[in-house]
């Protein structure tokens, strides 16, 4: 299983994020997408306040998705929200 993990520095506006999902996330081919608030950390303040995850069954599906116009457009729109974020790709066993 492959995941793209997006960590937002602050929580996005709920209406704006709903628009982002409807217009830019839903067109991306993936087996699952989830998102939510970060509510804590065992080591003081959390490093981020909101997370999102895309999930793919295999590397081939992941590569097809991240090289798509839809994935690029989603990243551009995420940047347009003006919230600093990081993206990590992970292979989950």
How would you describe each model-predicted region?
Residues 1-67, 87-93:
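Short S/T/G/P-rich N-terminal loop/turn motif that feeds into the first structured element of a domain
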Residues 25-28, 71-76, 81-82:
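A common structural junction motif
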């Amino acid at each position: 299983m492959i995941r793209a993990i997006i960590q937002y520095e602050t929580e996005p506006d709920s209406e704006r994020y709903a628009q982002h999902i409807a217009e830019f996330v839903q067109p991306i081919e993936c087996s699952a997408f989830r998102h939510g608030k970060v509510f804590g950390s065992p080591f003081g303040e959390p490093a981020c306040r909101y997370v999102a995850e895309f999930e793919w069954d295999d590397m081939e599906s992941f590569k097809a998705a991240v090289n798509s116009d839809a994935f690029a457009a989603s990243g551009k729109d995420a940047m347009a929200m003006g919230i600093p974020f990081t993206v990590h790709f992970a292979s989950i066993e």
